[in-house]
């Protein structure tokens, strides 16, 4: 039986991970749970899975959590705040930690888990995108495994099994095209938050669904693939695949192409990250290619989706620039979800902030450098947007 801790247990990744644990109680045991704000769901999860340690990031909810767990017939460790999340990440005899915390907030807990010798089921791509220069050396130093738990990188990881070290020519990341893949670019200026949250294929959290709509999600995955698989950026390509059946492909030196296929269901890559190198039998719906009928592909439209080029540029710049890109995107998406900016303002703000960053040529940033760049970029998005809002108010008065 494998013992696991789940960071971000009340989010999309966390709840699907716990669905797997509930389905396979003889395979997995939950040692730790950590969440951000959803105290009611976290409490229910603790009652069901009986972890040894639990933490909620929002300290305002800590006493409520303690009260809701007072009826338990055992006494788990109950913590609060960011340090509480870090404690869960490195706690006890968990063999694997699922990192499902959204955004760069997952970086410090992931580092704590690595230093504690835990294998990482990586569902938080931002950790590697922002912290790759720090995280990868720690992975090597502590001898832990970094197993991708998102569909695209899991697909690549699976396709690479048995491929010789120099056998890989390039990676092809598939993208659904997001909520607006069939919408003309001239109509994007009027789309709403609710429009953007209607993903045609996947059930995901709000932030990643917006990233899918801008295709920044795919741009971030390019940077993640660079760190995970060691390829230069000109050997990582994006292709639009509306059906989301092929989760990604690799091209080998002899021009052979290998692909991993399956229904768009996040449980599959999560299960593989938890069970690797084993394959566990499931009773989930099997892929019926006759039912699917056809698989189609398109060239991505860089005019419609400028976030892809921004991501490639940040990745090639290296240093702390990917952290700036990631933080600017997180902050811009948050503003969009709050309906403070329009959909097309997301890439505009990101580009503005990346252009203002002046220390991107630092080849080997420290953790402090990355955290500083992250905080600077978030503040810069707010400042840039305030200038835009002020300008809009002046225009409206005139």
Swiss-Prot record:
Q: Which reaction does it catalyse?
A: 2-C-methyl-D-erythritol 4-phosphate + NADP(+) = 1-deoxy-D-xylulose 5-phosphate + NADPH + H(+)
**Keyword Manganese listed:** yes
Q: Where does Mn(2+) bind?
A: 150, 152, 221
Which SUPFAM superfamilies does the entry mention? 1-deoxy-D-xylulose-5-phosphate reductoisomerase, C-terminal domain, Glyceraldehyde-3-phosphate dehydrogenase-like, C-terminal domain, NAD(P)-binding Rossmann-fold domains
Q: Which cofactor does it need?
A: Mg(2+); Mn(2+)
Keywords for this protein: Isoprene biosynthesis, Manganese, Metal-binding, NADP, Oxidoreductase
Record-annotated residues binding 1-deoxy-D-xylulose 5-phosphate? 125, 151-152, 176, 199, 212, 217-218, 221
Provide the top EC class: oxidoreductase
Its pathway is:
Isoprenoid biosynthesis; isopentenyl diphosphate biosynthesis via DXP pathway; isopentenyl diphosphate from 1-deoxy-D-xylulose 5-phosphate: step 1/6
> InterPro entries this protein is in?
DXP_reductoisomerase (IPR003821), DXP_reductoisomerase_C (IPR013644), DXP_reductoisomerase_N (IPR013512), DXPR_C (IPR026877), DXPR_C_sf (IPR036169), NAD(P)-bd_dom_sf (IPR036291)
In the record, what terms sit under GO molecular function? 1-deoxy-D-xylulose-5-phosphate reductoisomerase activity; manganese ion binding; NADPH binding
Q: Supply the Pfam families for this chain.
A: DXP_redisom_C (PF08436), DXP_reductoisom (PF02670), DXPR_C (PF13288)
- Highest taxon of source: Bacteria
Report residues binding NADPH.
10-13, 36, 38, 124, 126, 205
- What family, per the record? Belongs to the DXR family.
Job of this protein = Catalyzes the NADPH-dependent rearrangement and reduction of 1-deoxy-D-xylulose-5-phosphate (DXP) to 2-C-methyl-D-erythritol 4-phosphate (MEP).
PANTHER family in the record, alphabetically? 1-DEOXY-D-XYLULOSE 5-PHOSPHATE REDUCTOISOMERASE, 1-DEOXY-D-XYLULOSE 5-PHOSPHATE REDUCTOISOMERASE, CHLOROPLASTIC
Q: What is this protein called?
A: 1-deoxy-D-xylulose 5-phosphate reductoisomerase
The primary gene name is dxr
């Amino acid at each position: 039986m494998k013992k696991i801790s789940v960071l971000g247990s009340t989010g999309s990744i966390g709840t699907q991970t716990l669905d797997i644990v509930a389905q396979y109680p003889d395979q997995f045991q939950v040692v730790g749970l950590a969440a951000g704000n959803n105290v009611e769901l976290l409490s229910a999860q603790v009652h069901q899975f009986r972890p040894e340690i639990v933490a909620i990031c929002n300290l305002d909810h800590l006493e409520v959590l303690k009260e809701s767990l007072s009826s338990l017939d055992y006494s788990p460790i109950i913590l609060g705040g960011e340090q509480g999340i870090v404690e869960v990440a490195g706690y006890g005899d968990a063999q694997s930690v699922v990192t499902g915390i959204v955004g760069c907030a997952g970086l410090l807990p992931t580092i704590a888990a690595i230093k504690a010798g835990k294998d990482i089921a990586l569902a938080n791509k931002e950790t590697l995108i922002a912290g790759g220069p720090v995280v990868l050396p720690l992975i090597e130093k502590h001898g832990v495994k970094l197993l991708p738990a998102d569909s695209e990188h899991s697909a690549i990881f699976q396709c690479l099994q048995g491929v010789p070290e120099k056998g890989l020519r390039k990676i092809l990341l598939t993208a659904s095209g997001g909520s607006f893949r069939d919408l003309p670019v001239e109509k994007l200026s009027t789309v709403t938050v609710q429009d953007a949250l209607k993903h045609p294929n996947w059930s995901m959290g709000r932030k990643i669904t917006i990233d899918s709509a801008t295709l920044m999600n795919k741009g971030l995955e390019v940077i993640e693939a660079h760190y995970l698989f060691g390829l230069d950026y000109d050997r990582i390509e994006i292709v639009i695949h509306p059906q989301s059946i092929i989760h990604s492909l690799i091209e080998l030196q002899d021009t052979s192409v290998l692909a991993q296929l399956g229904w768009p269901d996040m449980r599959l890559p999560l299960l593989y990250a938890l069970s690797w190198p084993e394959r566990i039998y499931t009773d989930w719906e099997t892929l019926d290619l006759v039912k699917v009928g056809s698989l189609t592909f398109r060239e991505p439209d860089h005019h419609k989706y400028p976030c892809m080029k921004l991501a490639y540029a940040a990745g090639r710049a290296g240093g702390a620039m990917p952290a700036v890109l990631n933080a600017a995107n997180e902050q811009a998406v948050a503003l969009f979800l709050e309906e403070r900016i329009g959909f097309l303002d997301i890439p505009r703000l990101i580009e503005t902030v990346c252009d203002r960053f002046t220390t991107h040529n630092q080849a080997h940033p420290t953790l402090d450098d990355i955290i500083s760049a992250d905080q600077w970029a978030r503040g810069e998005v707010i400042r840039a947007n305030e200038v835009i809002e002020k300008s809009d108010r002046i225009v409206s008065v005139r």
